[in-house]
Amino acid sequence: MNKNIDTVREIITVASILIKFSREDIVENRANFIAFLNEIGVTHEGRKLNQNSFRKIVSELTQEDKKTLIDEFNEGFEGVYRYLEMYTNK
């Protein structure tokens, strides 16, 4: 498994939390998102993230790693999906 997957998993967890708290604005702007990640202490190989390192760790993921991470992300929103379904199917 790719060594970057844990860092990307942490990044996805942060994105998930921001989305759940309606702060998509932070996630949608890459520079702001990277600044936010740095502020909360997310690092790659002991260094703060920047545009290049962010792009690099994501691009080095295998297709299998990406699928695993997407499945984990969607699983985290399962409760939200059920909630929305409950209120939209009245």
Curated annotation (Swiss-Prot):
This is 10 kDa anti-sigma factor. Interacts with the host sigma factor RpoD, and thereby inhibits its interaction with the catalytic core of the host RNA polymerase. The keyword Transferase does not apply. Transcriptional inhibitor. Inhibits sigma 70-directed transcription by weakening its interaction with the core of the host's RNA polymerase. This allows Gp55 to successfully compete for the core enzyme. Plays an important role during the prereplicative period of phage T4 development. Pfam families: AsiA. One of its GO terms (biological process) is regulation of DNA-templated transcription. InterPro entries: AsiA, AsiA_sf. SUPFAM superfamilies: Anti-sigma factor AsiA. The gene is asiA. Keywords: Transcription, Transcription regulation. It comes from Enterobacteria phage T4 (Bacteriophage T4). Coiled coil: none annotated.
